[in-house]
């Protein structure tokens, strides 16, 4: 399965290759479906499943290492995944159709706008985080502690998911003739067929891997640092705002020259900066309190030890 899925990437580096040869090499089928054991499996759905499994494994390991309840993590994963998918789909509906079209389909009972398929990552991220906060608050568990162990897994899962987008031909880039441009032959994902398309999905996947590594390094000595949530919001907000300029799929929802995702990215950046500063202050106060308590107990233990030790004989 891995060689089949990676075949579209076989000439990511075309340095020293003629442009015509590069074009011919890149005219490969992008595998919107992968045949396994006689079954035709959508590559997008397969990569989404792999992304979820990878995120669960990383989060489970980190949760166990932090001494948190792993059973609560599994319940949390199911809740956030379900709510996240719903939020991702709803945001797709709102950026694809006007409010009048949505309301009209509800009034006439056809619900036609809800019969189309599509997902927008930001919708899933926002609703998923909110649903996780509600669950942990009801359970009287620390949202920040669980966020610290779970959040680094999000960009990893997102990176794998974007490979699924690349294989399926959705979330595609602008039509531009570059050495790494790809040529889609199957219109099922919505990408234009037979023209050079910038592989923005792979670029975003690489950026998400970088964010994943940064978050792992940041939490190496701060395993329960809730500020990692805001650091992720800041990093991904900047990443997504910039990469949106290279996107060409129609689900953009342009307003005042910026896409819906860019407006959300601006909010994410502000949220990340403010939240990170406040969270770091909170963590510093907690660490200071713990250090003060530790320093107060040390003299007490020394006094007890000296009282119990035999006196010097002169």
Residue spans for each PLM region:
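A feature for loop-to-transmembrane-helix boundaries and adjacent hydrophobic helices
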Residues: 26-314
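Compositionally biased, low-complexity intrinsically disordered regions
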Residues: 6-9, 308
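Short, Lys/Arg-enriched N-terminal segments with co-localized hydrophobic residues
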Residues: 1-3, 10-29
């Amino acid at each position: 399965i891995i060689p089949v899925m990676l075949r579209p990437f076989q000439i990511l580096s075309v340095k020293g290759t003629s442009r015509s040869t590069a074009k011919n090499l890149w005219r490969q089928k992008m595998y919107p479906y992968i045949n396994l054991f006689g079954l035709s499996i959508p590559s997008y759905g397969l990569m989404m499943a792999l992304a979820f499994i990878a995120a669960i494994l990383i989060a489970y390991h980190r949760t166990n290492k932090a001494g948190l309840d792993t059973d609560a993590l599994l319940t949390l994963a199911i809740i956030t995944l379900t709510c996240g998918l719903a939020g991702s789909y709803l945001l797709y509906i709102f950026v694809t159709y006007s409010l009048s079209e949505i309301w009209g389909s509800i009034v006439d009972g056809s619900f036609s706008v809800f019969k189309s398929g599509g997902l927008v990552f930001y919708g899933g991220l926002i609703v998923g985080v909110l649903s996780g906060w509600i669950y942990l608050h009801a359970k009287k568990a620390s949202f920040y502690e669980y966020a610290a162990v779970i959040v680094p897994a999000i960009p990893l899962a997102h990176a794998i998911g974007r490979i699924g987008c690349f294989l399926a031909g959705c979330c595609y880039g602008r039509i531009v003739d570059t050495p790494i441009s790809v040529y889609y032959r199957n219109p099922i994902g919505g990408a234009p067929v037979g023209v050079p398309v910038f592989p923005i999905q792979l670029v975003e996947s690489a950026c998400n891997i970088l964010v994943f590594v940064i978050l792992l390094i940041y939490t190496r000595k701060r395993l329960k640092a809730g500020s990692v949530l805001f650091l992720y919001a800041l990093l991904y907000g900047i990443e997504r705002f910039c990469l949106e300029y290279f996107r060409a799929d129609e689900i953009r929802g342009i307003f005042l020259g910026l896409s819906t995702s860019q407006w959300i990215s601006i909010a994410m950046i502000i949220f990340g900066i403010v939240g990170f500063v406040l969270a770091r202050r909170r963590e510093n106060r907690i660490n200071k309190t713990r250090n003060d308590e530790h320093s107060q107990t040390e003299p007490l233990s020394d006094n007890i030890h000296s009282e119990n030790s035999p006196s010097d004989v002169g």
